[in-house]
Amino acid sequence: MDSAAPALSPALTALTDQSATADLAIQIPKCPDPERYFYTSQCPDINHLRSLSILNRWLETELVFVGDEEDVSKLSEGELSFYRFLFAFLSAADDLVTENLGGLSGLFEQKDILHYYVEQECIEVVHSRVYNIIQLVLFHNNDQARREYVAGTINHPAIRAKVDWLEARVRECASVPEKFILMILIEGIFFAASFAAIAYLRTNNLLRVTCQSNDLISRDEAVHTTASCYIYNNYLGGHAKPPPDRVYGLFRQAVEIEIGFIRSQAPTDSHILSPAALAAIENYVRFSADRLLGLIHMKPLFSAPPPDASFPLSLMSTDKHTNFFECRSTSYAGAVVNDL
């Protein structure tokens, strides 16, 4: 008995139908723009960010999490639950960003922007793989337990609040510039509290390599949000920008959701995340929003003060010297504009 032939995807079906009736040919425009066929720099600011990304490439294989596995047992039950939740969210959100990058890059012809997005997609893959490793560390390498937890957590109300808000804003999105505002909010606001809460592990000398990877990922995301701001400012000619009230409204809503996210999940039995630490994280989220508004040439919304020197993410801004025992240097080549 003959088995049924596997179904083809729509794209492959179209290709098969076309090849059955005519030879495939590359269509070259009659009057092509010569710059289409060679590289020329058109976006120096984006090209700088691409170069910075290349200088600071890193891989998940450079980090060794053995010591972190021992530290998991030092977390309280509430702390362990909290950090499992954060990394379940970050992993899912990071994959969502990766899926959307292809759609954004297709809007542009400038090769600097296209080349930059290639670099961003590559490092987002590394982030996804690192989050996979950290999740397994938090579940004592029990993959089945991790799978069951993620399946039961991904629709948690705190996560759904972010996803539902984003889906609603995308549906009502009236312009390409507004899509970039949403990307700025995803990477610049919806990750901010999680990055800060993870950094507080450092103050207790816990999960050192997880904190190290958090430094690297936080810096990468700072580059990504800066790129979105540059594109919003300089490369969306012909597209009407959303009115200021609309932009401020989106920022205000995103900040409220992010602060609600961290408040609803913060452990009550924690010596890592004290009430003062949570207040500092909330201020950091507001400060991040004001900084991003400044990058798109708008006045601050919250006038939040910058975090003080004791804030754990402040350590990202200090000069670092790689010591013999450090698995991977977290010193960034070049200047990185971050939230501090």
Curated annotation (Swiss-Prot):
EC number of this enzyme: 1.17.4.1
Name under which the protein is recorded: Ribonucleoside-diphosphate reductase small subunit
Function statement: Ribonucleoside-diphosphate reductase holoenzyme provides the precursors necessary for viral DNA synthesis. Allows virus growth in non-dividing cells, as well as reactivation from latency in infected hosts. Catalyzes the biosynthesis of deoxyribonucleotides from the corresponding ribonucleotides.
Gene name, Swiss-Prot/TrEMBL: RIR2
BP GO annotations: deoxyribonucleotide biosynthetic process; DNA replication; release from viral latency
Chief localisation class: host cell
Location of the protein in the cell: Host membrane
Reaction(s) catalysed by this chain's protein: a 2'-deoxyribonucleoside 5'-diphosphate + [thioredoxin]-disulfide + H2O = a ribonucleoside 5'-diphosphate + [thioredoxin]-dithiol
